[in-house]
A protein has these predicted regions:
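Bacterial N-terminal signal peptides that target proteins for export
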Residues: 1-11
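Alpha-helical transmembrane segments
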Residues: 14-18
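C-terminal motif of bacterial Sec signal peptides marking the signal peptidase cleavage site
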Residues: 19-23
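Bacterial signal peptide processing site
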Residues: 25-28
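Mature extracytoplasmic or organellar-lumen-exposed domains after removal of signal/transit peptides
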Residues: 34-213
């Protein structure tokens, strides 16, 4: 009977330790999962902070400066059309170059709206199709379309992207890498430049709005 009691005692003791080890194992596993979850949450928070900083300290300010300068460009061109002085033309060239500079800086992050909405090729296709431009502007009704109230929409819908964007405006404003002389830009080309600059402005603001929310 004593031997049987010993056997029972050993069996109970073994069961107790077995349950204890299992409980410890479960506790350790739970602690490990909690620790890993905490680390993952910390990583996610760090990544979110990096992304937020990239968007609001790099992307948004870049597109904002580009958009503001593109808006100034349209105003400059309209002012030059009313008052064709060299100072007004130089101001348009200055704002064009500033907007273009910010666009070139943004080429480091052409993902997102620039690619999703096809804005990159829309405003930066090269080369400009000069023969097609001459042919288009040879028709009076085409010039009238670009000179209406919806001049920017007309540019977007009537012109192909080989006639749009920075290179289209640049062709009108500059010659041999320098601002053209005041009074040398034909009226039809000035109408074209204003319309294309308006479409360019719209695309720049679309980029900004897409990132800024």
């Amino acid at each position: 009977m004593k031997k049987l009691s010993n056997y029972c005692f050993v069996a109970i003791l073994s069961l107790f330790f077995s349950m204890s080890f299992t409980a410890c194992s479960d506790d350790n596993e739970d602690d490990s999962k909690k620790e890993e979850q905490q680390k993952q949450e910390e990583r996610d928070k760090a990544y979110a902070e990096i992304v937020d900083a990239f968007i609001h300290k790099t992307v948004v300010p870049t597109y904002e400066k580009m958009a503001l300068k593109s808006s100034e460009l349209v105003k400059d061109l309209r002012e030059y059309r009313k008052n064709p002085t060299q100072a007004n033309l130089d101001k348009a060239c200055e704002d064009f170059l500033a907007s273009r500079m910010w666009w070139e800086r943004s080429e480091a992050f052409l993902f997102g709206a620039a690619s999703d909405f096809g804005i990159d090729p829309h405003i930066d296709s090269w080369p400009l199709d000069c023969p097609a431009l001459e042919k288009y502007l040879a028709t009076a009704t085409n010039i009238e379309d670009l000179d209406g109230d919806d001049y920017d929409i007309a540019a977007r819908t009537k012109l192909g992207q080989e006639l749009l964007g920075y290179h289209g405006v640049e062709y009108i404003l500059f010659k041999d890498g320098k601002p053209r002389k005041a009074g040398t830009i034909e009226e039809k080309f000035l109408v074209y430049a204003i319309a294309v600059a308006g479409d360019l402005r719209n695309s720049c603001w679309q980029l900004l709005a897409s990132w800024a929310g």
